[in-house]
Amino acid sequence: TEFDTILVVGSTGVDCPLPCQHWVTFHAELFEPWTLKRRENGYPEIPNYWASTYMGGLRRVTRSRIAYDTIFSEGGSSGMIVVQVARERLGAQKIVLAGVPMTIEGGQYDTGRLWAEALAYRDVWERKRDYLKTFVRSLSGWTREQFGEPTLEWLHAEG
């Protein structure tokens, strides 16, 4: 199965060799070093960058030489922001999450450490569960338990 658009979250964009169209994070201050590392890896440039405003304000004062768009966020980690960008700004009808398990043991991609905060970020996902279930599937962890895996039938179904 081919995907129309690929969005990467946070530091995964450094290591993803695919031609991605959008890079999304809570941490816009890291776009510049991440982009340099991606370039050093010889991967294609990513043309669009997104960061969130959290509860109405920028998460941090961020100065970056890389221009990025913003989207309002109620929280839920960078994984939720990527869902919001895909659905609300890009009009995605179906979203497949890869590497967004939202579990303590799933850790964070670039640290290799347990992610104790994972449980705290789930509240937004839980509040939006019924809505998200209509168009989100996941390959791993708690998000897979909540939304199911993407089947070929689901991927190829209309809507």
Model-derived segments and their meaning:
Residues 1-159:
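Metal-ion/cofactor- or nucleotide/acyl-coenzyme-handling active-site neighborhoods
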